């Protein structure tokens, strides 16, 4: 299938043949949801930690004798019922990672890309290159393309410090290379702009 290419000025600049297996896949909302949830769960640190009664310091001596005081029996002042005692159900470090195999992951990315294309939220440009790190220049490119809340995806060799510096101060705008795209970044932005080289690299990875 052929897709139209735009120049950075927003003008038609030819067409590009793309793989239907990547950009014309069926929309699978359940798969996308599962992969996105798994991806975000894997990003959690899970470093919460509290101490149980066996881990807090102190409490070696019996606070008072077993019988005759009229008080409830106690064996240590580090019991959870005492101040400075251990936590009853202490939180421990935990991994939230969920297993997602390669076929599911690539299927979700294909489904998202195809749906973005069907909804008219995908734009393809010849290349994305800035000679100087100027936010004003990058903003003019965005305005010319008529997009907002946008993710720019470029080829690995096309990604440069100028692109990063020019875009980092713009709200709801991000730039990444084709290796860094993931289901979460694709669904978080309303629009996506890809260069020709980025499309070829994505196809090589997903086909």
From Swiss-Prot:
GO terms for molecular function: rRNA binding; structural constituent of ribosome. Transmembrane segments: none annotated. SUPFAM superfamilies: Ribosomal protein L4. Keywords: Ribonucleoprotein, Ribosomal protein, RNA-binding, rRNA-binding. One of its GO terms (cellular component) is ribosome. Signal peptide: none annotated. One of its GO terms (biological process) is translation. It comes from the Bacteria. It holds the Pfam family Ribosomal_L4. Part of the 50S ribosomal subunit. Belongs to the universal ribosomal protein uL4 family. This is Large ribosomal subunit protein uL4. It comes from Francisella tularensis subsp. mediasiatica (strain FSC147). The gene is rplD.
């Amino acid at each position: 299938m052929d897709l139209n290419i735009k120049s950075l000025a927003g003008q038609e600049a030819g067409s590009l043949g793309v793989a239907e297996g990547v950009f014309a896949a069926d929309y699978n909302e359940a798969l996308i949801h599962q992969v996105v949830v798994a991806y975000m769960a894997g990003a959690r640190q899970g470093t919460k930690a509290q101490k149980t009664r066996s881990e807090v310091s102190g409490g070696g001596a019996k606070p008072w004798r077993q019988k005759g005081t009229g008080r409830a029996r106690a064996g240590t002042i580090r019991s959870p019922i005492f101040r400075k005692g251990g936590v009853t159900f202490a939180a421990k470090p935990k991994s939230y990672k969920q297993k997602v195999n390669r076929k599911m992951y690539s299927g979700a990315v294909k489904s998202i890309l195809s749906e973005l294309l069907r909804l008219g939220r995908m734009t393809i440009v010849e290349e994305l290159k800035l000679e100087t790190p100027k936010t004003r220049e990058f903003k003019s490119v965005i305005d010319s393309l008529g997009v907002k809340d946008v993710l720019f995806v470029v080829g690995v060799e096309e990604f440069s410090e100028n692109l990063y510096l020019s875009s980092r101060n713009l709200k709801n705008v991000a730039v990444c290379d084709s290796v860094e795209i993931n289901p979460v970044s694709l669904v978080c932005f309303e629009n996506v702009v890809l260069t020709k080289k980025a499309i070829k690299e994505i196809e090589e990875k997903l086909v």
